[in-house]
Amino acid sequence: MIEKIIKDELEKFYPEMIELRRYMHMHPEVSFNEKNTARFIKEYLEKIGITDIKTKVGLNGVVARIKGQDSSKSIAFRADFDALPINDAKNTSYKSTIPNAMHACGHDGHTTALLATCKVLIQNQEKLPHDVVAVFQYGEEQAPGGAKPMIDASCLQDVDAIFGAHLWTPLSLGTLGYSYSELCAAADRFEVKINTKENANIIAAEFVSMTQQIVSRFSKPRETLVITLGKLESSIEKASITGTIRHFNKELHKMVLTKLQNLCKALENEYSGTNIEFIYYGGYPPLINHKKGTIEIQKATSKILPDIKQLEIEPLMIGEDFAYYVEEVPGAFFLIGAGNSTFAKYPHHHPNFDFEEEVMKQTASIFLTLAFDSANVINNLKGEQ
């Protein structure tokens, strides 16, 4: 039975998984600078016998293909591998050795889970119905991210379904967090620069006040829209305001941009000798799962991890560039609990962040169950838009 093979193989590889994760944790590389990590991934894939490997996909991406019995279809899994510009404050044997670089979001765990998935697959290749594509992605933490450049470089070529996971310390180990639709919000960044012969403090204050009226007047009561102004610097003649827009609706997003630009023009007209520049930096689109993709995740989890608690979660107001993949092909993204009440209690992006390493085995087991059942999974996702 394939479930027994998955469990036995992952149990056997688990000490190696811990070694892989801790090596990456000790040698983190921040977004768009992950050359050594990419090389580490490639060399490990070669070591376990995978030959179809593409490197420098997009920039630092690595894509591996494992042949199944029928290569006319394929299923993909994605793991991100970039770190954050944070100093690791943990007192552990595997804390970061690189100043101002830390795996403070669990991407080392994601990568380890997918490497373990690849190892089990290559050793049981004859049982694999269709090809499996392993997408190791750089640059998730910093927009514009690595997903879009990797897609533009054809990482999804001939892919029929894609799945991804994020280990999540707000959920306890032994919990699956799922959503049938919206999971992560779009996160767009903008900046407003004010130059004036009047008082920039007053103009900036009026801009701040009016942005919240956009939220209250122009969004529907059940429609999520958050405009956050995170930084304001002001003197008499100059002011700078930076903010983010978070939403799940592209039409609402267009409306908000228009309203903010119109607000800048209105303030220019109201205060003589004033020039206001609105700069839009963009961000990730909302991550909206395909319902059938989430159902396949739930089925796989029930099959391989019957004791795990499955919890439908509210949409998160964070950005995640896996959104780009499910805009291209059917699939879904899930959260998997990695927290506890002791060392793994800290939020993501915290200098003391850590997680229950057992979650890597659980993530790999879900990926493997989907992969070995890829004929049914791909067929069940047909027609998903």
Task: Please name every model-derived segment.
Residues A76-R78, N87, F190-V192, F333-G339:
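Non-cysteine beta-strand/loop elements that form the S-adenosyl-L-methionine
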Residues I2-H103, D108, T112-L115, K119-L128:
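Acidic/His- and Gly-rich active-site-bordering loop/insert found
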Residues M1-R22, P28, D70, Q123, ...:
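N-terminal hydrophobic/helix-forming segments and targeting peptides
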Residues M24, A64, F77, H107, ...:
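Divalent metal-coordination and catalytic microenvironments
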